[in-house]
Structure formats: C-alpha cells, structure tokens
Amino acid sequence: MPRKIILDCDPGIDDAVAIFLAHGNPEIELLAITTVVGNQSLEKVTQNARLVADVAGIVGVPVAAGCTKPLVRGVRNASHIHGETGMGNVSYPPEFKTKLDGRHAVQLIIDLIMSHEPKTITLVPTGGLTNIAMAVRLEPRIVDRVKEVVLMGGGYHTGNASPVAEFNVFIDPEAAHIVFNESWNVTMVGLDLTHQALATPAVQKRVREVGTKPAAFMLQILDFYTKVYEKEHDTYGKVHDPCAVAYVIDPTVMTTERVPVDIELNGALTTGMTVVDFRYPRPKNCRTQVAVKLDFDKFWCLVIDALERIGDPQ
C-alpha cells in the first residue's frame, strides 16, 4: 500500500529533487504539493513548484500556495544558495500546465487530513513550518489524524543560518515550536543527516546517464547548486530535502535515535536552535526522533530509480 504524503515545500533546488522522488517512487502516493515562503518568496517558490510538476509530468495532484511570511518574524530567504528565482538558472515557459488549487495551502492540508482515514497521511515539510503550524491552530483535530510528521529541518551539531540554527527552523522558530510540541510523532531529518547527501560528480554522472528531460533538468539545477556550494562552502551540493521523502519510502535508508527535541525561541545567540537531549535515561513516551546516519548508496539509488520511472512525460 503506497504511503500517502503531503509535501509542504519551498522550491528550492533540493525541494525539486524531493518532488521528483515523491512522484517517481511507487511506494508514495503524493496527495498534494503545498508551498510556503522560505528559499524564496511565496510567489517564486509556487512558480517553481508548478515548473517542477510540469517537468515531472505530475497530473491530478493539487498544488496550492500557502503562507507569505512567518508567524511573527520578518521574511528571510536563501537566494544566495538557490538563486534569484529559487531554481538556479533554469528558464520558464510562457505558462504552466499545472494550475493552482483555489484553496490556501493550509486549508488544503486540513481538508485532505480530515477527509482521509485517520493515521493514513504523513506530512513531509521541507521548508519552514509556517503552513503546518497554521493548520494545527486552525484545526487542532488534525494532530490525532496524522500518521507522522517527517520534516527536513534542524540539526543537533551545527547550523547553517547561524552557528546553531538550521534555516527552515530559523526562519520561523515559533512555527517549529508548535510542530515539535504537539502530540504527534515527529522525525527530524536535520543537517547532521542531510550533509551526508552529497551530489558528488559520480552522482551527477548517474543522473546524466538516465538520459531524459527530467534528468537533464535535475542535472542543470544540481550543477548550479554544486557550484554555489563549492564556492561558498568548499564542498559538493548537499541535497537536503529528498532525504525526508526517502525516509518515508524506506526508513532503513537512515538510522535514527528517539530523543527529546525542543526549539529555542529567546536566545541572544541561539534563536531557532533545535535543542536535542541525548542524555540517558531517555523518556519512554518520547514522540520525537532525529536522523543520524545516511545510507548514501541506498539514498541515491532511490532518487535515480524515481527519475528512471518518471521517464520522459508527454
């Protein structure tokens, strides 16, 4: 039985890879793509979601735009990583085949969760958590109906938006605090894991060998991404967001530890930090777990297989 997910994202180059993976893997039933301000403005990330849906040949999956700004803070973006469009240097068609759902993303999330059987939908946020927090506040009953939240965000060893805070949590820590403190199960796929998901030359060669238009698109954005990382960070591109989707497909793609997690909201130097408590004894009723180690080969095999299954959509 395919796992039903709602992918709440801010495309974003690595979000695009996550969309390809979710669409191309038969173990996933992609119920919706919802967008939130993050890597770029809401307008730009929504445009990018429609572009990627067109490239991947996604039909019949609603795409809806969500929150334009965090719950209480100002807007920050990551144009220095993803470019001014949020999707590197790709070109855009005069119009998109993929039409926007008329509902706000938060309402679409609520509608889908409330209309499906309880514990059948996994939320996969790969951007800031504003939409998810808003959905919880508008319709608290969704918490008991969601199977799990598997998010890309946070980190227990290092940050990227600050020395200790990861970007997705940093841009809306109040939303993250809401999501992590609800009574649902949360798997945090953070920087400690995603920094292992490198788009190495060997990986890019495998993408090129797929030989389809979606593969060429992915190669183009990964090339842009890698050049930015090589210049700014002296490393290969770190493909964060598809790691969360990969976990839903096959949890053995990474190892996790069940530990308490909370969000720092008031620190002079630590706002947005995901505070992970590895001390023993561990709480028996702990609802949060953090990803630790990635099976690199298994992860990239999932991505390449999804690309091959997508083929060349008409």
UniProtKB/Swiss-Prot annotation:
Q: GO terms for biological process?
A: nucleotide metabolic process; purine-containing compound salvage
* Gene3D superfamilies given in the database record: Ribonucleoside hydrolase-like
Which residues participate in Ca(2+) binding? D10, D15, T126, D241
InterPro entries recorded for this chain?
A: I/U_nuclsd_hydro_CS (IPR015910), Inosine/uridine_hydrolase_dom (IPR001910), IUNH (IPR023186), Ribo_hydro-like (IPR036452)
Annotated active site residues, numbered on this chain, are: H240
User: What molecular function terms (GO) are annotated for this protein?
Assistant: calcium ion binding; inosine nucleosidase activity; purine nucleosidase activity; uridine nucleosidase activity
User: Which PANTHER family does this chain map to?
Assistant: INOSINE-URIDINE PREFERRING NUCLEOSIDE HYDROLASE, URIDINE NUCLEOSIDASE
Report the protein name in the record: Inosine-uridine preferring nucleoside hydrolase
* Species assigned in the record: Leishmania major
